[in-house]
Swiss-Prot record:
Keywords: Golgi apparatus, Membrane, Sugar transport, Transmembrane, Transmembrane helix, Transport. It holds the Pfam family Nuc_sug_transp. The lineage of its organism: Eukaryota, Metazoa, Chordata, Craniata, Vertebrata. It comes from Homo sapiens. This is Probable UDP-sugar transporter protein SLC35A4. Mediates the transport of CDP-ribitol. Does not exhibit CMP-sialic acid, UDP-galactose and UDP-N-acetylglucosamine transport activity. InterPro entries: Nuc_sug_transpt.
């Protein structure tokens, strides 16, 4: 399996096993995000500012990267610090920041279910930008596999879970909100297209940057998360009055921050040693984890749409990574 296919060529079984374990952990952390957020709710809402959670997550990632360099887990490059190579990561941080904030604004122009279904278009935008920017061609089988991933995400978002006793499927916990009719405004559609493009561009650009630079991953992450902390600190400070930085935080909230920070570090390894396509499969597979945890922790029921989505994800993985 090649790097473009998401594998790591030339590795022995122990390192390949660690790579597989890393992908499984990342999948679990992605899937646990929405259920953990739901456990943070007080009186039906998140008791802390979302910008606080994002800022603390970026700060945690930055501290972990700095610690790994200080204790020598990853060697510092010889010679003076390559600060000039830090500048390109400012664009990565800006793209990720824009992407995270667009998610919030999109909710104003469409209902949660429409967002959950149509946001799967970012799989297609990532694949197109992956081919154009990194000059990798996808086979017909691989293209079909990504289409199946999009269909699986849309299927799950449309009704993979339901409240016990309710015969109508409901959106997953991440999209749970007060009932409202399906709708999307013209501006919402434009913003959604922009969101999908930025999502794909941020992923592909970061992958290209990390692979071209011959720097330790921890140092590259140090650059990226330094800009991320500065950007999110500015957004948090400019967000107006509201709860303090740590106000409303609980043990569950701390677990959300820690899991997202660790998952961000795992994803950076995927971007450097794997590919943006690998990341898409991790995110898609996390839907299964999300559904199972929602059923166990939040007492939601799995529907036929969940099992159909799981089947589509399995078929997509078989098509993309199977023998060709």
């Amino acid at each position: 399996m090649s790097v473009e296919d998401g594998g790591m060529p030339g590795l022995g079984r122990p390192r390949q096993a660690r790579w597989t374990l890393m992908l499984l952990l990342s999948t679990a952390m992605y899937g646990a995000h929405a259920p953990l957020l739901a456990l943070c709710h007080v009186d039906g809402r998140v008791p802390f500012r979302p910008s606080s959670a994002v800022l603390l997550t970026e700060l945690t990632k930055l501290l972990l990267c700095a610690f790994s360099l200080l204790v020598g887990w990853q060697a510092w490059p010889q010679g003076p610090p390559p600060w000039r190579q830090a500048a390109p990561f400012a664009l990565s941080a800006l793209l990720y920041g824009a992407n995270n904030n667009l998610v919030i604004y999109l909710q104003r122009y469409m209902d949660p279910s429409t967002y959950q279904v149509l946001s799967n278009l970012k799989i297609g935008s990532t694949a197109v930008l992956y081919c154009l920017c990194l000059r990798h061609r996808l086979s017909v089988r691989q293209g079909l596999a990504l289409l199946l991933l999009m269909a699986a995400g849309a299927c799950y978002a449309a009704g993979g879970l339901q409240v016990p006793g309710n015969t109508l499927p409901s959106p997953p916990p991440a999209a749970a909100a007060s009932p409202m009719p399906l709708h999307i405004t013209p501006l919402g559609l434009l913003l959604l297209i922009l969101y999908c493009l930025i999502s794909g561009l941020s992923s592909v650009y970061t992958e290209l940057l990390m692979k071209r630079q011959r720097l330790p991953l921890a140092l590259q992450n140090l650059f990226l998360y330094t800009f991320g902390v500065l950007l999110n600190l500015g957004l948090h400070a400019g967000g107006g009055s509201g709860p303090g930085l740590l106000e409303g935080f609980s043990g569950w909230a701390a677990l959300v921050v820690l899991s997202q920070a660790l998952n961000g570090l795992l994803m950076s390894a995927v971007m450097k040693h794997g590919s943006s396509i690998t990341r898409l499969f991790v995110v898609s597979c996390s839907l299964v984890v999300n559904a199972v945890l929602s059923a166990v922790l939040l007492r939601l029921q799995l529907t036929a749409a969940f099992f159909l989505a799981t089947l589509l994800i399995g078929l997509a993985m078989r098509l993309y990574y199977g023998s060709r």
